[in-house]
Regions:
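Small-residue-biased structural context
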Residues: 1-144
Length: 144
Protein backbone atom coordinates (compact mmCIF):
# COMPACT_ATOMS: atom_id res chain seq x y z
CA UNK A 1 0.00 0.00 0.00
CA UNK A 2 2.83 2.40 0.85
CA UNK A 3 4.28 2.16 -2.65
CA UNK A 4 0.96 2.86 -4.37
CA UNK A 5 0.16 5.65 -1.92
CA UNK A 6 3.54 7.23 -2.68
CA UNK A 7 2.96 6.91 -6.43
CA UNK A 8 -0.40 8.63 -6.08
CA UNK A 9 0.90 11.37 -3.80
CA UNK A 10 4.15 12.40 -5.45
CA UNK A 11 4.46 11.51 -9.14
CA UNK A 12 0.78 12.01 -9.92
CA UNK A 13 0.50 15.31 -8.02
CA UNK A 14 3.88 16.93 -8.65
CA UNK A 15 5.99 15.15 -11.26
CA UNK A 16 3.35 14.60 -13.95
CA UNK A 17 2.16 18.24 -14.01
CA UNK A 18 5.76 19.27 -14.69
CA UNK A 19 6.00 16.72 -17.48
CA UNK A 20 2.77 18.05 -18.96
CA UNK A 21 4.33 21.51 -19.25
CA UNK A 22 7.53 20.06 -20.72
CA UNK A 23 5.60 18.02 -23.28
CA UNK A 24 3.47 21.01 -24.30
CA UNK A 25 6.62 23.10 -24.70
CA UNK A 26 8.22 20.29 -26.71
CA UNK A 27 5.38 20.42 -29.24
CA UNK A 28 6.12 24.11 -29.86
CA UNK A 29 9.57 23.03 -31.08
CA UNK A 30 8.48 19.96 -33.06
CA UNK A 31 4.87 19.65 -34.22
CA UNK A 32 5.43 16.03 -35.23
CA UNK A 33 5.45 15.21 -31.50
CA UNK A 34 1.88 16.49 -31.01
CA UNK A 35 0.21 13.07 -30.95
CA UNK A 36 2.93 11.45 -28.85
CA UNK A 37 2.87 14.25 -26.28
CA UNK A 38 -0.93 14.27 -26.15
CA UNK A 39 -0.91 10.52 -25.50
CA UNK A 40 1.63 10.81 -22.69
CA UNK A 41 -0.34 13.64 -21.08
CA UNK A 42 -3.57 11.63 -21.34
CA UNK A 43 -1.78 8.64 -19.82
CA UNK A 44 -1.04 10.72 -16.72
CA UNK A 45 -4.79 10.88 -16.03
CA UNK A 46 -5.29 7.20 -16.83
CA UNK A 47 -2.41 6.18 -14.54
CA UNK A 48 -3.81 8.32 -11.73
CA UNK A 49 -7.24 6.68 -12.09
CA UNK A 50 -5.74 3.18 -12.22
CA UNK A 51 -3.63 3.96 -9.16
CA UNK A 52 -6.66 5.22 -7.29
CA UNK A 53 -8.54 2.01 -8.10
CA UNK A 54 -5.63 -0.13 -6.89
CA UNK A 55 -5.31 1.94 -3.72
CA UNK A 56 -9.04 1.55 -3.12
CA UNK A 57 -8.75 -2.25 -3.43
CA UNK A 58 -5.84 -2.30 -0.99
CA UNK A 59 -7.69 -0.07 1.48
CA UNK A 60 -10.74 -2.34 1.37
CA UNK A 61 -8.56 -5.38 2.09
CA UNK A 62 -6.83 -3.60 4.98
CA UNK A 63 -10.26 -2.67 6.36
CA UNK A 64 -11.20 -6.35 6.37
CA UNK A 65 -13.48 -6.28 3.36
CA UNK A 66 -13.29 -9.49 1.36
CA UNK A 67 -12.75 -8.83 -2.33
CA UNK A 68 -12.11 -11.31 -5.08
CA UNK A 69 -8.47 -11.99 -5.73
CA UNK A 70 -9.08 -11.43 -9.44
CA UNK A 71 -10.30 -7.90 -8.66
CA UNK A 72 -7.06 -7.02 -6.89
CA UNK A 73 -4.95 -8.75 -9.54
CA UNK A 74 -6.74 -6.89 -12.34
CA UNK A 75 -6.31 -3.54 -10.60
CA UNK A 76 -2.61 -4.20 -9.97
CA UNK A 77 -1.98 -5.46 -13.51
CA UNK A 78 -3.78 -2.50 -15.06
CA UNK A 79 -1.77 -0.02 -13.02
CA UNK A 80 1.57 -1.71 -13.66
CA UNK A 81 0.99 -2.22 -17.38
CA UNK A 82 -0.07 1.39 -17.91
CA UNK A 83 2.83 2.73 -15.87
CA UNK A 84 5.51 0.56 -17.50
CA UNK A 85 4.26 1.37 -20.99
CA UNK A 86 4.12 5.05 -20.12
CA UNK A 87 7.68 5.17 -18.75
CA UNK A 88 9.08 3.21 -21.69
CA UNK A 89 7.34 5.50 -24.18
CA UNK A 90 8.58 8.65 -22.43
CA UNK A 91 12.15 7.38 -22.31
CA UNK A 92 12.09 6.18 -25.90
CA UNK A 93 10.13 8.97 -27.60
CA UNK A 94 10.23 12.15 -25.56
CA UNK A 95 13.13 12.41 -23.13
CA UNK A 96 15.81 12.39 -25.87
CA UNK A 97 13.88 15.02 -27.84
CA UNK A 98 13.35 17.16 -24.74
CA UNK A 99 17.07 17.14 -24.00
CA UNK A 100 17.73 18.12 -27.60
CA UNK A 101 15.02 20.75 -28.13
CA UNK A 102 13.92 22.39 -24.89
CA UNK A 103 15.51 25.73 -24.12
CA UNK A 104 16.46 27.31 -20.82
CA UNK A 105 13.17 29.24 -20.98
CA UNK A 106 11.26 25.98 -21.43
CA UNK A 107 12.97 24.39 -18.43
CA UNK A 108 12.26 27.55 -16.42
CA UNK A 109 8.55 27.15 -17.25
CA UNK A 110 8.72 23.53 -16.10
CA UNK A 111 10.46 24.56 -12.89
CA UNK A 112 7.76 27.17 -12.22
CA UNK A 113 5.21 24.42 -11.58
CA UNK A 114 4.85 24.04 -7.79
CA UNK A 115 6.37 20.94 -6.30
CA UNK A 116 7.29 19.46 -2.96
CA UNK A 117 10.37 17.54 -1.89
CA UNK A 118 10.18 13.87 -2.82
CA UNK A 119 8.86 12.23 0.38
CA UNK A 120 10.59 8.91 -0.38
CA UNK A 121 13.93 9.87 -1.88
CA UNK A 122 14.27 13.55 -0.98
CA UNK A 123 16.59 14.94 1.67
CA UNK A 124 13.63 15.61 3.99
CA UNK A 125 11.96 12.26 3.39
CA UNK A 126 8.65 11.52 5.08
CA UNK A 127 8.81 9.31 8.17
CA UNK A 128 6.05 7.03 6.85
CA UNK A 129 8.36 5.93 4.03
CA UNK A 130 11.38 5.02 6.18
CA UNK A 131 10.69 1.26 6.13
CA UNK A 132 9.87 1.31 2.42
CA UNK A 133 13.09 3.19 1.67
CA UNK A 134 15.05 0.61 3.68
CA UNK A 135 13.38 -2.27 1.82
CA UNK A 136 14.22 -0.68 -1.53
CA UNK A 137 17.86 -0.25 -0.47
CA UNK A 138 18.09 -3.91 0.58
CA UNK A 139 16.55 -5.08 -2.69
CA UNK A 140 18.98 -2.90 -4.66
CA UNK A 141 21.95 -4.37 -2.80
CA UNK A 142 20.70 -7.91 -3.40
CA UNK A 143 20.26 -7.20 -7.11
CA UNK A 144 23.90 -6.14 -7.53
Amino acid sequence: RAIIYYMRQYPDRFHHPREDVAFNRLVTHDQTLQLTCARRIQEHAVIAAAGEELLSCLDRIIAGVVIERSTLEAAAATYLIYYRHHLAAEERELIPRAVELLTAADWKAVSAIPTEPDPLFGTDSDERYRELRQQIAIMAEEAE
